[in-house]
Amino acid sequence: MESGSGSGAALNSTPFPTYSTPNFTDDYDWNSSDWYGLTNQCQAVSFSKLIVVPCLVILLVFCLIGNLWLLFKLLEKTVKKVSTFILILMCLNSFWGCLCMIFSIVENFAEFSTSVCKLRMVVFWVYVFFDMFLICWLCFDTWCAVWFSVRRTEANQKCWVFCTVALIILAFILSMQKALHVEAIKEYGQVRSSCQFHKETHSTLKVFNVAVSVNVLGFLLPLLFLCIFYGMCLWKLYKAVFKTKTKVIKTMLLFVFMFLLTWGPYYILSFIDGLLSAGYISESCSLKKTLGLMLPLLGLWGMAHGGLQVFIYILCNSHFNKSLFSCFKK
């Protein structure tokens, strides 16, 4: 168990405090309120690594095997549709997410330096942002297919590559602003340092801007994009008459639902944590304990999105369903 920072006055203004026992008779007259401030520290709560590490290993193996299988299925035929190309990129991004899981596993047994903390943060947020951008791209492609007649040409394939490079660069740019403010900090009572946002070295406005920009650009605006374009698609499909419209609607709803189910809770608590770090929400031990416990857990659950997309493909692939059911019948 690791101890967090106190909710009252800080005992030491330096980011790496010493742990010598205070002498109550030297240079200072300790009263009851000072003693209360020393002993009433908010103790951070975290899951035991005996629980977290096995879950991460299982998730890592599942994502690797599942996405390798899905990647081979998608590459069996020539890639002619942009939706297939996006699914391939999702598989590759899931392998990048596996690197995030490896960092999380190692973090439970090793002490990261500030440079490694920044690298870990970049890897994690590039995975998150690129995953969100791919879902938005898939949404836009579906909207184009429903509302317009889009031809598959060589020029379009060049555009796919250009869009992919642009989205990767944008994901790196957005992740860098988060990583630049992360440091390896050893707080009062901690056995070893951990990767944290060091708000003491930054202004309140900068802390707030980082918290808001990451959540707005990474979640709220893409979510608004999904709601508008998928809403237009659903309205168009609902009025149309063709056999496969139910399958298309089911696919769209599954992709959006899976993303909201996996990343939605993490972004909500991350936004609250940003407001707390910036001082816009009054600190309390119960709130800090809840955020300290739930954010790593929800981050782990969010990374499960890379494995759940395999199930989305299975549920939406009628050919695979027929083969699966025929195997059960035998």
Curated annotation (Swiss-Prot):
Keyword Nucleotide-binding in record: no
UniProt keyword terms in alphabetical order: Disulfide bond, G-protein coupled receptor, Host membrane, Membrane, Receptor, Transducer, Transmembrane, Transmembrane helix
Single GO term (MF): G protein-coupled receptor activity
Keyword Translocase: no
Membrane topology classification: Multi-pass membrane protein
UniProt cross-references to SUPFAM superfamilies, sorted A to Z: Family A G protein-coupled receptor-like
Disulfide bridge partners, by residue number: C117-C195
Superkingdom: Viruses
Subcellular location: Host membrane
Record-level GO cellular component terms: host cell membrane; membrane
Transmembrane segments: 50-70, 85-105, 121-141, 160-180, 210-230, 252-272, 295-315
Family, as annotated: Belongs to the G-protein coupled receptor 1 family.
Name this polypeptide is given: G-protein coupled receptor 74
Organism of this sequence: Equine herpesvirus 2 (strain 86/87)
